[in-house]
Amino acid sequence: MTNGMIRIIGLDPGLRRTGWGVIEAQGTRLTYVACGTILPPENAPMAERLAELHRGLAEVLARHAPDEAAVEETFVNMNPSSTLKLGQARGVVMLAPAQAGLSVAEYAPLLVKKTVVGAGRAEKAQIRMMIGVLLPKATPQTEDAADALAVAVTHAHHRGPAALRRAAL
């Protein structure tokens, strides 16, 4: 982008639903571009679901041409099988923008919540409400899309050499 403007895609990885949100940042000014949710077929074999997730992300990346990507880190839950499946989806979510030539930064959920809401233990409803305040034209239809916009906002606030170096490791 020109004039110091950068287009950022935020991604909230999931095997059932992956949220994406695109914003433009110029200095401290943030502008909503688009958001949505990719829904791989739930009853399809794992490889097919991952392939559909990749296809959907590649389409979004081609349509919105972001300059940088940011992905929310995932947490390990009590069910090892669920954690492994989420890890596979997260791998695809990180791969697609990297294949498109983008740097991919990662942010912990706690930092995303603290950046957007001001509290690391914020609820989903608080995140969605603050996204409406920060990006008045945004109309995320799912929590996943709202979370993805929150990841993009976090990247806009925390990006820079350190975040991009972490992404390159």
Curated annotation (Swiss-Prot):
Residues annotated as binding Mg(2+) 1: 12, 144
Keyword DNA-binding appears in the UniProt entry: yes
Pfam families for the chain: RuvC (PF02075)
Cofactor needs: Mg(2+)
Keywords per UniProt: Cytoplasm, DNA damage, DNA recombination, DNA repair, DNA-binding, Endonuclease, Hydrolase, Magnesium, Metal-binding, Nuclease
Gene3D superfamilies cross-referenced by the UniProt entry: Ribonuclease H-like superfamily/Ribonuclease H
Residues reported in the UniProt entry to bind Mg(2+) 2: 72
EC number(s) on file: 3.1.21.10
Top-level taxonomic group: Bacteria
Signal peptide from the UniProt entry: none
GO biological process, one term: DNA repair
Subcellular localization(s) per the UniProt record: Cytoplasm
Cofactor descriptive note: Binds 2 Mg(2+) ion per subunit.
PROSITE patterns per record: RUVC
First-tier enzyme category under EC: hydrolase
Record HAMAP family: RuvC
Entry protein name: Crossover junction endodeoxyribonuclease RuvC
